């Protein structure tokens, strides 16, 4: 069995194939040579979020099987906005904003695939390089003539927008399918790209690209979609009460990222291990079986958090996340670095900025809502339930001082076992 056949079987076993065109032909096509595939990532923000992890990791899986991945960053399509299954029209951003996002996303994508000199070395491409070179007349004549509006409005992704009362769809967004389809034809011609992958919401755009490539280039190409990740409780994957989980450590810290995966529900964890890690399906099945047979805390969440944090933030990011987690649990903060505390300030703990040079602990507890009243704050202190930077506070008249802050900037207040507030001295 070839590496490619093993890959396709593995993708199926992981539940990573939603739809596929001509699956038997695709398997044969991939098994005969190093093939080039691509996935597009439109810059809708200055960072990718964890919703992009599945396609990024599938690009990596294909590369490991000997194929050449192209990560397309949509410098052109990002200026338009994909209407697929969106309730309303996206806000249009300026060329400068999108251009800046393109550069940041290029750097992020580069962390997931290998840019070797080998035949299957990865590349990052920007569709502004070819879409920006074609004028309107050429586009209408060479691309537009191959599309039937009758067929386009029957695409489920477009149909939902047209049928939604008070919404509709602009010609700008309606034309998105043509641009994405042209990407496939352009990459097929320039890079001999024969496979496009994407989320299952991209099926209409991908099949449009397959048809356009056949018409323009007279070439047979393929499409494969990946399932959109859902949670068993019906809530949206990748969102928390505090917002989106980003891949950029300046937007979501490695610690918060690690904690997100650690909080995965038992009903989701083994599915997520199949989607987001490179553990074999047999290894994942063994973890699941072990968790079922052993009473107490399951191992699945810890394995998932470690594997995905290592993939996105490297060994250093994982070590930091585990160090912070252990320190907060034990109450011993002596191992924390200034960078660790900056992570907690970003999104790890509720935080309060202090401008005064000192403040009583009682005031600190009530202001941070760790105590509902001064009386209750004193009771907590008297019961030994309050600590500052890992040291128990016994005196109800104790004062929090900037000179005692960690690295001259941070004071970690803990009440009980799990309630924290981070004071940041200005």
Curated annotation (Swiss-Prot):
Enzyme class: ligase
Motif ('KMSKS' region): 236-240
Binding, L-tyrosine: 38, 176, 180
Keywords annotated in UniProt: Aminoacyl-tRNA synthetase, ATP-binding, Cytoplasm, Ligase, Nucleotide-binding, Protein biosynthesis, RNA-binding
A biological process from GO: tyrosyl-tRNA aminoacylation
PROSITE patterns: S4 (PS50889)
Subcellular localization: Cytoplasm
InterPro entries from the UniProt entry: aa-tRNA-synth_Ic, Rossmann-like_a/b/a_fold, S4_RNA-bd_sf, SYY-like_C, Tyr-tRNA-ligase, Tyr-tRNA-ligase_bac-type, Tyr-tRNA-ligase_bac_1
Domain S4 RNA-binding: 359-426
Main location: cytoplasm
Binding-site list for ATP: 239
Gene Ontology CC entries for this record: cytosol
GO molecular function (one): RNA binding
KW ATP-binding (keyword) present: yes
Motif ('HIGH' region): 43-52
Enzyme Commission number(s) of this protein: 6.1.1.1
Keyword Nucleus appears in the UniProt entry: no
Family: Belongs to the class-I aminoacyl-tRNA synthetase family. TyrS type 1 subfamily.
Record note on quaternary structure: Homodimer.
Name listed for the protein in its UniProt record: Tyrosine--tRNA ligase
Organism: Aliivibrio fischeri (strain ATCC 700601 / ES114) (Vibrio fischeri)
């Amino acid at each position: 069995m070839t590496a490619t056949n093993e890959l396709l079987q593995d993708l199926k076993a992981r539940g990573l194939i939603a739809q596929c065109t001509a699956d038997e032909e695709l398997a044969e096509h991939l098994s005969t040579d190093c093939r080039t595939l691509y996935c597009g990532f439109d810059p809708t923000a200055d960072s990718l979020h964890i919703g992009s992890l599945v396609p990024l990791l599938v690009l990596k899986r294909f590369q490991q099987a000997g194929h050449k991945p192209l990560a397309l960053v949509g410098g052109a399509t990002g200026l338009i906005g994909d209407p697929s299954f969106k309730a309303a029209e996206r806000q249009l951003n300026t060329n400068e904003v999108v251009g800046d996002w393109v550069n940041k996303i290029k750097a992020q994508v580069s962390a997931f695939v290998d840019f070797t000199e080998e035949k299957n070395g990865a590349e990052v491409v920007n569709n502004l390089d070819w879409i920006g070179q074609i004028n309107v007349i050429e586009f209408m004549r060479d691309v537009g003539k191959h599309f039937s509006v009758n067929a386009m409005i029957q695409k489920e992704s477009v149909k939902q927008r047209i049928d939604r009362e008070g919404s509709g769809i602009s010609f700008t967004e309606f034309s998105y399918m043509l641009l994405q389809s042209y990407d496939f034809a352009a990459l097929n011609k320039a890079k001999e790209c024969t496979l496009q992958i994407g989320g299952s919401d991209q099926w209409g755009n991908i099949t449009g690209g397959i048809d356009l490539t056949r018409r323009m280039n007279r070439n047979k190409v393929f499409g494969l979609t990946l399932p959109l990740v859902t949670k068993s409780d019906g809530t949206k994957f990748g969102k928390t009460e505090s917002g989106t989980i980003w891949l950029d450590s300046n937007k979501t810290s490695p610690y918060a990222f690690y904690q997100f995966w650690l909080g995965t529900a038992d009903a989701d964890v083994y599915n997520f291990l199949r989607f987001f890690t490179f553990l074999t399906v047999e290894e994942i099945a063994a973890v699941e079986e072990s968790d079922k047979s052993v009473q107490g805390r399951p191992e699945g969440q810890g394995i998932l958090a470690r594997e995905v944090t290592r993939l996105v933030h490297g060994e250093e990011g994982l070590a930091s996340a585990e160090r912070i987690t252990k320190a907060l649990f034990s109450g011993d903060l002596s191992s924390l670095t200034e960078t660790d505390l900056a992570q907690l300030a970003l999104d790890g703990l509720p935080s309060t900025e202090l401008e005064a040079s000192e403040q009583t602990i009682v005031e600190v507890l009530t202001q941070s809502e760790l105590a509902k009243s001064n009386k209750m704050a004193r009771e907590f202190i008297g019961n030994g339930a309050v600590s500052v930077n890992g040291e128990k506070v016994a005196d109800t008249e104790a004062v929090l001082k900037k000179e005692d802050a960690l690295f001259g900037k941070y004071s970690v207040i803990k009440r009980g076992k799990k309630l924290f507030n981070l004071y940041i001295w200005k």
